[in-house]
Amino acid sequence: MTVFEIPADTRSKQRQASNPNQSVWVSANAGSGKTHVLASRVIRLLLQGVAPSKILCLTFTKAAAANMAARVFDKLAQWTQLSGGDLCAQVVATGAPMPGSEQLTLARKLFARTVETPGGLKIQTIHAFCERLLHLFPFEANVPARFEVAEDLRRAEFLRRARREVLAETSSSGGALHAALQRITDECGPDAFEDLIKEAMKHRAILRAPFLHEPIEILRRSLGLAEGRDIARIEREMAEDGIAPARWNDLAVLLDQGSANDQKKADLFRKAALTYRSPRSEGEFGNCLDCYLAIFFIGKGKGSKAQRLLTSGLMKKHANAGTELYAEQLRLDGLRAERRTAATFDRTRALIEVASAISKRYGEEKAARGILDFDDLIEKALALLERSDARWVLYKLDAGIDHVLVDEAQDTSEAQWKILEELTGDFAAGRGQSPGPRTFFAVGDEKQSIFSFQGAAPLMFDEMRRKFAAQFTAGAQPFAHVPLTLSFRSAPGVLSAIDKVFEHGDHKTGLVAANDVWMPHQALKHQLPGLVELWPLAAAPSGEDPRAWTLPLDLLDAQDPANLVAQRVAQKIAHLVKPGSEEFVHDSQTLGPRPVRPGDILILVRTRGPFFEAMIRALKRSQIPAAGADRLELAQHIAVMDLIAAGRASLLPQDDLALACVLKSPLIGLDDDDLMALAPGRAASLFDALQASADAKHSGAINKLARWRARAGGSPFVFYAGLLGADGGRRDIEARLGPEAGDAIDELLRLAIAHEDARSPSLAAFLNDLAGLEHSIKRDMEGAEDAVRVMTIHAAKGLEAKIVFLPDTCGVPWPRRDPKIFRLGTTVPGEETIAWSPIKDFDCEVVAAARGKARDAARDEYRRLLYVASTRAEERLYIAGFHGVKEPDPGCWAKMIEGALANEAGIQTVPAFWNGEDHILRLIS
């Protein structure tokens, strides 16, 4: 293959995007070189003599910031050693004009100048920028002078403590908060309560209102609930303001004349009349109302339906009674809707009261220790910048920032956009101390916004582009919108298939702005062969499961369709990487064909569930090198579970379960036969039986336990450092579980050190903290060894591979993932509150609309997730899926892709490699 020449049009766009004299908004397709453009712009700013301290480059993750910094510094370091001609070519490659001798001299000095500048070139996450800003102005921002930033683990610990203390105080004290807590627990159990509070804490800005009645009154207005209207009053109106209770028995007599259905309603009228008396208990009135409503409606909640009230024969005889009953049904239906609204208000008010108390205690916990969390950084920095004297703050911040660059702009949250607006407020008007232009640069792709759970607001991407363009244009400052559509990554055949999928029907909804057309991708590697395969979906067999036992929920067996797909993928990969196979990919360096390696392959899934584990198991059973999980749930990792068991057994050897676990672990290495020689028929504890045994293996175990017990009184780090180091624990664990376990071990040791920094060290307290731990480790898969990578799509964003498998294409995001809490607003800008609705049947009209909006947003992100996944592929894309007895949802990825490509001209039908019955659809270019 030949070296690919970048088209002149693309080079022109790159030069325009990196032009340091104008503000630019770049909309970049996947693989279109946005990182290159951003780095080139930074370098061109430096080439123009802009001080490094005047440049602020904000990225979404620490890894992205490190990658960006490495690109810039590596390039500048390289320039220090180049000859004049080579340096000229490198400078021009950034988009800058041909340099003169002075500029060449400056280019050679840029590396030293950038490194030696106090504070250096600022390429960081927005949270890191906010942290630095608050450290510089703690008094003005009203934060502790030497605050620390709490990581997720410590934040979760503070939140658990705040929740525990508030619940303990509330349960014993009574009062309004006790009643609110009781109202919440009437709706959910202990586990659901914990999840509910976590979800509520995502709306802390609402919970931290100076006066609690403010969000509650906003809630009332948002729901459209009139003052004074509550559940009790509405229910009284249901029973008393329509057909008078005194007439219920008369209507029962009338209905007795009709059919069996009429007579059932007659019985309900009598029961309602019987339980309606004065004085009456709350329970009796509830039974009365249930009977009365059952006459008019089938079922309860929002999904209940109005039913026929009189049979045709009875309607002819008593038309007036029928008219009266249908009018009553209409009246009751309106009151039921209002009751759902009042119930939503009552339920949410209780949640706001309890969650606000927990939020307040959580804030006190942090303040007492001089700690801020990540949300605080954004909130406090925004409050500081919104002050009337914020210009002075910005000027003092390295004597002003003249150039702001934003990477991954599609993942920026609403609050973060406000910070960016404050930072660049004077840029559009041309105000400031700098003699040169002050510029704003943003690059992103709304099609790749998949982090809504972290606050990303994809709809704001286009909105903010238009807003910045209007502001700079109004201030007579140059502003350009540059689209980058040329892919430097994927083969034209892969890109063509992706275009066809998203051009089809409404598939582009949520990927492009309203009324915008789909912009087809262009491929730089126009001669690179591409392949897309659609495998038939694996379905669960219909009929009764022939197995005589029930498997655990998280375990798949050979009969499960998900396991079948995992085996097929592993079988295909084994063929691809088999020595002597005729399968080839094209080398990125030589541009020629070479055999497929395991590291060329990326398997992407939506979630880390049973299929994720089944896929890794299938690869290992096929003896295919696999990099393991991309993210480790620390407390659930087997190595950490073994180490926790070792700690517990050292503190209390009589804990038979902990001791048995550690005896079978790699730390000691006994097997089932060894335990069977000890455990059955023992007179005392397992530890006593172990001590009494003369077996050499058992003696070795006792000696290890003795060494561990001698260290158990010290700090957790000393305990585990000795166990893993001098005692050989790390070596033994990694020998059995593989090098992946090393990441979990390192994180456990880091947490042990953090535990010592935060409190008086204690192994027992540390193990107690680990018991409720919700902490995961993100492993670096980009630099993984030559092994197949199995990752979630979120974790793979920014990565690429020669060959990509999408084996999990039948799942859909709704309604299982519906939130329980919905954000509501009023007609007044800035007025926001929340509403809690546990299930759809409880929804009032306003919440039903909010739920529908949330589902639409989830569907949009679901489609964007498919775009991100499919654009990771360079040469080959294999698509598979599995489902249960029922057909998959028509809106799932598998159906989207099949509908767009199944009838495509040139598609081939080939026999499946796993049997002689199924067929694969194949597109080759």
Which residue ranges define each predicted feature?
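Walker B catalytic acidic pair
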Residues: E408
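Conserved ATP-driven helicase/translocase motor core recognized via long
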Residues: T2-V3, N29, K54, P190-L372, ...
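Conserved ATP-dependent motor core of P-loop NTPases, especially the RecA-like helicase ATPase domain
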Residues: N19-N21, T59, A63, L76-N287, ...
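Conserved helicase/translocase P-loop NTPase motor core
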Residues: Q124-C130, L159, L351-D402, Q416-I419, ...
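Core structural elements
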Residues: L121-L133, I184-L207, L351-I358, L372-A381, ...
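Active-site-adjacent bridging/hinge elements
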Residues: L38, P99-L104, R132-P138, Q329-D333, ...
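Conserved motor-region signature of P-loop NTPase helicases/translocases
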Residues: M1-A70, D74, A145, E151-L153, ...
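Conserved catalytic motifs of ABC-family nucleotide-binding domains
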Residues: P815-D856
